[in-house]
């Protein structure tokens, strides 16, 4: 049966970031940091190359990043692939998008997939150039790739606020060496640390995000983040994807989305309390 994704919400920055408190500049009552409202528009350069154009509600043509600001967005996420078959989401394409975001004064999240194409809970394929690597060599490749991309951005004056070390890594990344299951997460922990250490080396103030899916499923969330704690995985923020509604052929409609959204929202304060993130 073919399922159609209706919605993807990345909740870590869009929700958890707004929940903590920081000291007031005047020394008074602590204030909450500004809410980060963001979107992943990593596909827009490819769309532009194919002739797609973007317009405001009033019909004014704008480039996609510029269109985000009047819609109330202040943050953008860009995914990174290692050696994509086409240039999209490779280092130079990501740099171009980040420079545009910088011009607009928007905060930036970098999302490392550590793959040549999409990585998600159902596929975490090792980049073709890395397929013969053992765990030690793979960890070095993760570190080198992370450092290379981030230093390229930093050298061009781009500031990065958040970095995802892996994308939807519920079942690990860089399979099989970095697979996560009930028996083991040690390989993943080593690979994640290799990436996270380089994030802090290049951007010491950037938040390292540990990102999984199924924000509505508290059993999965507790299993995963407790397993990470037991394996000594260090990170700054929890990142969650939410797919609240899929197409159901038997009813010829999308399933109701409200229950999963409400459950995801209810899970966030519990995660903050349990894992101090």
Which residue ranges define each predicted feature?
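Sec-dependent signal peptide recognition
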Residues: 2-10
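Bacterial Sec-dependent N-terminal signal peptides
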Residues: 15-32
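N-terminal substrate-binding region of glycoside hydrolase catalytic domains
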Residues: 29-107, 113-142, 148, 239
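Hydrophobic faces of well-ordered beta-strands that scaffold small-molecule active sites
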Residues: 36-41, 76-78, 108-112, 161-165, ...
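Residue-level signal for short, function-critical loop segments
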Residues: 82, 212-214, 241-244
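Active-site cleft segment of glycoside hydrolase catalytic domains centered on the general acid/base Glu
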Residues: 90-92, 99, 120-235, 247-268
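Short, glycine/acidic-enriched loop or turn micro-motifs at the edges of active sites
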Residues: 114, 171, 244
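Alpha-helix capping/termination and helix-coil
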Residues: 232, 242, 246, 275-276
